[in-house]
Amino acid sequence: MLEVYDDAVGACRPGAALADLDRRIRERIADAGYPGQPSHPVCHGVGARAHEPPYAHQAGGGTIEEGMVLAIEPGIYWEGGGGLRVEDNFLVTADAPEKLSSFPDGVVRCT
């Protein structure tokens, strides 16, 4: 899932189509053995509310623009409960997406 997340973050550039980002994430998850996942948007805007447009969706339109704040959240879920999702918020800049939290990516061991 971290590889899918990293790929999604890298594709989050001004001018990129939101539908292409959605398709890219879902294809990577399907290739890993989880077709049809996730059931929620894989990327959405963040502003006055935690979830707001734009929403990345294969059938949708729109492009990523510099200055947008986007939540990238690929995930997989198991029937009967449980799942795995990696999520963070990013400011879209001309050079590269800027992560807005200081929490480290990767696996964190809690003891």
Q: At which residue positions do the language-model features occur?
A:
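Active-site neighborhoods and metal-handling regions in enzymes and metal-associated proteins
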Residues: M1-T111
